[in-house]
């Protein structure tokens, strides 16, 4: 794990070690091992066509598809076993091109989905292409899906990679992140991390016969996506701090905290996405449904609530006053803090402000000790049913709908095991 040219190395935390390094920093044997592991995991998920892999005598993925500056993130257990892997990659020879250049080299996701979906995004054409990266191969060890350490590894490497890309030393090199995803898994998990992405209706893609990834796209509807690093704001960074606090706790407390954090959601959408126009009549104002930021939506909802046009209540609270615990709370202005129980007393659970809602889940709500205003606060409250009705309408226009609204289902399963 001692690589002088690594971008980040972290020692053991509750059984997980982390490494993020470019290809040129990895020994050849390490890269070969990673490519073999990637091939094996994609066979286990049935993303690869096993017959094609056998016919081509593949024992690892093709090293020719890995470029010198590609970045590899790995979470490793105490025995050196790989728990989770991800990569950020680019095609070669992007220098001098803009993201919107028609003749620039394509990213791998564009080779699958084409580029017509980019007609529905804005403010990307003039971004230097070398400031865009594709997030790919984010996968956990499929041989031990029920081990809590596997889920911890995924959370640890995702958090560290996101934070690293946001640091001043790297932020100028990472403006856009693209790729493709399964909306019912990856999209909800990005939502859990408060990372808004522009995405599109999932569809199936037929790759040429003999392509090893043909089953991945023929059998699993996927969507291309793109994220804007400038959409990350204080709400995102506070969320990451709350996730980090959970990961820094003991195993049982970690997964309880992740359960409880599902009750705090971001309603922000990507600034890159041009939303569809509402087709159906709605009691909610158009601005509330189509403003990417919830700040614009908040103002429209506040006006509608104060006029009685929607079944929401507008409240003004002072520091120390409790928010209602049996209703959704949409923060319009100010900051609130949620505390939870620990053996030695109460402890911080989550900080919430504009762009964040508290959505009580009846089965676990009692584990939140308090939810109080920390500053003067304007908040909208409503029932969970009415909030979810609004949220689904809003997601439909941005094409970010998923079957389930709340992320990290895998963590919930691990916590209940």
Q: What is each PLM-predicted segment?
A:
Residues 27-31, 267-319, 393-401, 406-410, ...:
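Cyclic nucleotide-binding regulatory module and flanking cytosolic helices
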Residues 54-70, 102-122, 364-366:
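Short acidic (Asp/Glu) patches
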Residues 198-280:
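Charge-rich, low-complexity intrinsically disordered segments
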């Amino acid at each position: 794990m001692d690589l002088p040219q690594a971008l980040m190395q972290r020692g053991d935390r509750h059984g997980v070690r982390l490494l993020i390094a470019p290809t040129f920093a990895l020994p050849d044997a390490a890269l070969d091992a990673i490519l073999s592991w990637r091939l094996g995991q994609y066979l286990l998920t049935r993303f690869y066509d096993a017959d094609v892999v056998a016919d081509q005598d593949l024992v690892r993925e093709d090293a020719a598809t890995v470029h010198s500056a590609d970045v590899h993130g790995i979470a490793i257990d105490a025995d050196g076993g790989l728990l989770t892997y991800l990569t950020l990659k680019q095609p070669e020879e992007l220098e001098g091109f803009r993201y919107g250049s028609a003749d620039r080299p394509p990213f791998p996701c564009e080779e699958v989905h084409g580029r017509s979906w980019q007609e529905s995004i804005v403010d990307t054409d003039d971004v230097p292409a070398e400031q865009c990266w594709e997030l790919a191969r984010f996968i956990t060890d499929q041989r031990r899906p029920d081990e809590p350490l596997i889920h911890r590894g995924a959370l640890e490497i995702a958090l560290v990679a996101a934070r690293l890309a946001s640091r001043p030393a790297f932020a100028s090199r990472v403006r856009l992140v693209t790729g493709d995803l399964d909306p019912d898994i990856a999209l909800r998990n990005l939502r859990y991390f408060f990372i808004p992405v522009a995405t599109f209706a999932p569809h199936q893609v037929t790759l040429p016969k003999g392509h090893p990834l043909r089953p991945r796209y023929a059998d699993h509807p996927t969507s291309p996506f793109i994220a804007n690093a400038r959409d990350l704001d204080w709400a995102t960074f506070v969320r990451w701090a709350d996730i980090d606090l959970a990961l820094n706790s003991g195993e049982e407390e970690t997964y309880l905290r992740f359960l409880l954090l599902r009750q705090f959601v971001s309603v922000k959408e990507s600034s890159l996405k041009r939303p569809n126009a509402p087709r159906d009549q709605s009691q909610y104002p158009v601005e509330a449904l189509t403003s990417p930021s919830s700040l614009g939506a908040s103002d429209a909802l506040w006006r509608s609530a104060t006029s009685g046009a929607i079944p929401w209540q507008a409240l003004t609270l002072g520091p120390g006053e409790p928010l209602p615990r049996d209703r959704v709370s949409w923060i319009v202005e100010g900051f609130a803090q949620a505390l939870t129980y620990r053996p030695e007393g109460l402890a911080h659970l989550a900080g919430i402000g504009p762009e964040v809602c508290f959505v009580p889940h009846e089965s676990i709500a009692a584990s939140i000790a308090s939810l109080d205003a920390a500053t003067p606060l304007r908040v909208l409250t409503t029932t969970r049913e009415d909030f979810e009705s609004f949220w689904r309408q809003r997601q439909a226009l941005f094409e970010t709908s998923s079957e389930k609204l709340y992320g990290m289902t895998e963590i919930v399963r691990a916590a209940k095991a």
